[in-house]
């Protein structure tokens, strides 16, 4: 059975906290992130981990649609409070996209956009460097690997509030 994360969460990364008066988790209290705020719907354990693996590597897009619809309902109030204008799925490197045939983050983003009546923009950011799978890297290697992996596309609109969608938040 799927159980969404509930209770007190870190203001920055959405990780569950032990004490109500805490605002930030240990990691977020000592490290600066490149994003202002995040929200996680589920913890990364079975059956979530298994279904995301199936979505990513076995074209089980129905899982992405389910997670997108669920996330839209679960996070609707927060997304409205943030005044999100567009959803931007984290892009894959062109070679990975060609191999997989689709971007799993885009599947989730499109399902969310459908429920929230928000546009999904897939050409705002480009993946310019192919990186190793992040799960194989330590925190310092992840940060270094991603520093030059993305570039904003030219001539893009200037939105104030965007929601960048990724399947997994890898904590440091």
Residue ranges of predicted features:
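Glycine-rich phosphate/pyrophosphate-handling loop used in enzymes and phosphotransfer proteins
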Residues: 1-171
